[in-house]
Amino acid sequence: MKLTHLAALALLPVLSAPVFAGDAGSLSNPNLPPAQFLAQERKGNLNMSTGNPNNRAAEVFYRTGALGTGKSTTHSVSLREGGVYAIYTDCAPSSCENVDMELLHNGRVVREDHMDDTYPLFHIIPSRSGAYTIRVKMAQCKPGHASCAYHTQVIKEN
């Protein structure tokens, strides 16, 4: 079993917990328009990582975009050695079926999440400071959707 799969198994209790969506304990509504859904997920990710859904000071990086099936894009982010980071990509389930994410350093994949889902995530403690690349690939939009809205978010946890 790959290390990323073991890490995902360790996160199952966290992933099965309700996501913050305005009121503690409520689930994000997958039928919301993409921008509203992603705004709720942004707060939910901050809440999971820092205990505060409005702690934007912990947000190292945040971008939104849209990709068609099979398309990918990259984002550059600076990470510090020894920092604890949570890296999330979420796509709006009203148009998205599967999105994948990889973290690269000096062209080498150091973390990846290729599970069949709409919320790839992982934690990392970099062994070196520097520029890292987040590659987002829209594996599958829902039928009838030319592109899917997504966001990528990096949160410093310590």
What are these regions (language model features)?
Residues 2, 19-20:
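N-terminal targeting/docking segments
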